Amino acid sequence: MGVIEFLLALAQDMILAAIPAVGFAMVFNVPVRALRWCALLGSIGHGSRMILMTSGLNIEWSTFMASMLGGTIGIQWSRWYLAHPKVFTVAAVIPMFPGISAYTAMISAVKISQLGYSEPLMITLLTNFLTASSIVGALSIGLSIPGLWLYRKRPRV
């Protein structure tokens, strides 16, 4: 993949990630003045995850690092705009949730219950369930670590 193709794919990924970030921000009743920042943070998070995955990291670690970046930026923006950090961060990580792997695991579980046990279905179920669980864990831990670092009162050492 050339540089131009990568930059176009990155721009497309970031623009498409901004749409669900704004949508969920509107569902969560985020103030109108913060919607553009939710979109930008969703784009930054999803774009950084794509960059990390393109550079060779797996999706779980890329999601963890991207959510840490989003959490750190969200905390800084909350100080600038006098809002709670969750205003920016929660809606911004929604585009990184593992919808496809969770859906595939659920469909595999339904097929196992309808058709009976088969090894390929069980492998599909477990692989996708563990992937989805790892990504959700990476998102939650990655969002909480910047708050633990940046709001700490005692010395770090």
UniProtKB/Swiss-Prot annotation:
UniProt-listed GO biological process terms: succinate transport
Gene Ontology cellular-component annotations: plasma membrane
Keyword vocabulary terms for this entry: Cell inner membrane, Cell membrane, Membrane, Transmembrane, Transmembrane helix, Transport
InterPro entries for this protein: ThrE_2, ThrE_Dicarb/AminoAcid_Exp, YjjB
Membrane topology note: Multi-pass membrane protein
One Pfam family, short name: ThrE_2
Spans traversing the lipid bilayer: 8-28, 50-70, 87-107, 129-149
Location of this chain's protein in the cell: Cell inner membrane
Keyword Cell inner membrane assigned: yes
Function: Involved in succinate export with YjjP. Both proteins are required for export.
Family of the protein in this entry: Belongs to the ThrE exporter (TC 2.A.79) family.
Protein's name according to its UniProt entry: Probable succinate transporter subunit YjjB
Gene assigned in the entry: yjjB
